[in-house]
Design a protein with these regions (language model features):
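C-terminal accessory helical subdomains adjacent to catalytic cores in phosphodiester-
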Residues: 1-5, 18-43, 59-205
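Catalytic nucleophile-elbow at a beta strand-turn-alpha helix junction centered on a G-D-S/GDSL motif
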Residues: 9-19
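N-terminal beta-loop-helix "entrance" segment that forms/cooperates
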Residues: 43-56
Length: 205
């Protein structure tokens, strides 16, 4: 059980994730005296889309060093699987189960931070979103379409995509068919794009 008055820094890749955490996750946890602070990787005007391994390591290690002497302070991440760049995961294609892939990457992240900082293992709790934050939009395609009334005419196409997969997190065949690409190919008037994602992330939930 998480102790009261806990502080958790969440390193995110872009503005959409930050807005999602501030609007959806943060209020829920604060009622239990768990205080969430999202911080954008690299710099606050970073647009997201790519997470370089060295940047991840630098930012997380810096945060760990700042909090290491303080009780009830922790660091986690929220990175899209397809946002990862140059992570040392050469053998990951041999892993078929998507959740095993997630565990594989998170273990590399944890081991890297522990080797660099020698902090207590519980200080850093890595998290990778499979495959993207946009995958969660397929949890309720009717609610997604309600945000933009012109999108209702695409609801059958979106539902067919959802029905083809075990869960929204399974929606993926390749880089060109990841959730964001599927939304870009289906939704028009207005067209779905990265700016739309930032607007939708806080309100669709």
């Amino acid at each position: 059980m998480t102790p009261p008055n806990t502080h958790i820094f969440i390193v995110v890749e872009g503005q959409s994730e930050k807005e999602f955490i501030n609007t959806v996750i943060k209020p829920t946890f604060e009622s239990n005296q768990i205080y969430i602070c999202p911080t954008i990787l690299g710099r606050n005007n970073h647009k997201g889309g790519h997470v370089q391994f060295d940047r991840f390591k630098r930012d997380v290690v810096s945060l760990i060093k700042q909090i290491d002497k303080q009780n009830n302070f922790f660091v986690t991440t929220m990175f899209d699987f397809y946002g990862l760049e140059d992570f040392p995961v050469q053998d990951i294609e041999q892993v078929n189960n998507i959740y095993k892939k997630e565990e594989y990457i998170e273990k590399i992240m944890l081991d890297t931070v522990l080797q660099t900082t020698q902090c207590h293992p519980e200080r850093f709790i890595p998290y990778i979103q499979l495959y993207e934050l946009e995958g969660l939009f397929f949890s309720d395609v009717e609610k997604l379409c309600s945000i933009q009334p012109n999108w209702y005419k695409f609801i059958s196409q979106l539902q067919n995509i959802r029905n083809d997969f075990e869960t929204p997190e399974h929606i993926n065949n390749s880089f060109d068919t990841k959730p964001s690409k599927r939304l870009e190919n289906v939704l028009f008037s207005p067209k779905y794009n990265s700016k739309t994602k930032t607007l939708l992330s806080p309100i669709i939930w």
